């Protein structure tokens, strides 16, 4: 049985999205003295690794895309900062996050986990999706607080009624 994350990656690949795309950039700062385009340069500073190693799950054209099914608060922060870095560097026009709305009742309804042989274990499925797991409400509050900079972000929150055990 394929995990939702693996299935999602296959769909993205079929649509020609590149997976695990990283951005790195140096910054060139030029200081000029005087007015106008002909003002002489008085100093030049290069800041290496100004943007260093931010990653998005998927990228194609002007869109960065992240899939966060069992996200923690800090994961959203990382994703929004990556979107911001890609956007400010002129690489993307929009970031998209697909996540789930809190649906812990659904996970509780699944009962116990199975081992690799299909035998029920003592651990519940819902234990993986505990109190530290967040949903769209935490993501929206982070976007409202400006964590994505000027990058527009489209959030798709999958509701509990749209999830089936199949």
Give the role of each language-model region.
Residues 1-61, 74-81, 88:
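Active-site metal-binding core of divalent-cation-utilizing nuclease and nuclease-like domains
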Residues 23, 99, 159:
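Residues at the C-termini of beta-strands that transition into short coil/loop
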Residues 27, 101-102, 163:
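Positions that flank functional sites
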Residues 31-33, 132, 146-147, 154:
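Generic detector of intrinsically disordered, low-complexity, polar/charged segments
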Residues 52, 56, 70-144:
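Catalytic cores of nucleic-acid endonucleases
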Residues 64-67:
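Glycine-rich active-site/cofactor-binding loop and its immediate structural neighborhood
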Residues 140-166:
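C-terminal functional extensions of proteins
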């Amino acid at each position: 049985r394929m995990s939702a994350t693996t299935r999602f990656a296959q769909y993205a690949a079929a649509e020609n999205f590149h997976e695990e795309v990283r951005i790195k950039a140096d910054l060139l700062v030029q200081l000029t003295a005087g007015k106008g385009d002909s003002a002489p340069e008085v100093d030049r500073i290069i800041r290496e690794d100004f943007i260093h190693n931010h990653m998005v799950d998927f990228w194609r054209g002007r869109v960065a895309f992240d899939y966060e099914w069992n996200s923690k608060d800090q994961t959203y922060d990382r994703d929004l900062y990556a979107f911001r870095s890609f956007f400010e560097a002129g690489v993307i026009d929009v970031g998209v996050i697909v996540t789930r709305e809190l649906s812990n009742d659904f996970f509780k309804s699944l009962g116990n986990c199975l081992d690799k042989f299909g035998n029920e274990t003592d651990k519940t499925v819902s234990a993986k999706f505990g109190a530290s797991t967040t949903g769209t409400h935490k993501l929206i509050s982070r976007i409202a607080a400006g964590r994505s900079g000027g990058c527009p972000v489209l959030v798709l929150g999958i509701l509990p009624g749209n999830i089936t055990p199949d």
